Amino acid sequence: MQKIFDAHLHLWDLGKIPISWIKDDEKLEQNYDFFRMKQEYKEFEFIGAMYVEVNSDDLEKEALFALEQKKLHNLLFCLADFKHKEELSSFREVMHVSKKGAKRLFEVDFEEKIEILKTFNIPFEACMKNEEL
């Protein structure tokens, strides 16, 4: 059986995490939980996943949800918040939602984040649109 590690897994429970950007999209405006995902991979030997933040409206609620998923399902996780940096496998910032787009990379607080990432040896994922590259 083919082994699979999902390196970019989004999960959400709309009762726990507010996510306004999925409103009015019937395919997205529903819960996507770990067991639903496991069903999608039933033809594979699932060996793990990296939970990636979903750009929710409440980073703290999402961090708590992600921590719960990590403990329940032994997931790695990538968040956009340093509050739980000792638990992070990776850090993510969604650039295309910033008014400055990729220019966000040159702001002082972003440089400070990079220093924290270097100190704690945490990989970084930038999410941006192709035209911003």
Give residue spans per PLM region:
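An N-terminally biased module of ancient metal coordination in phosphate/nucleic-acid-related enzymes
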Residues: M1-E68
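Active-site gating/metal-coordination segments in enzymes
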Residues: D57-E132
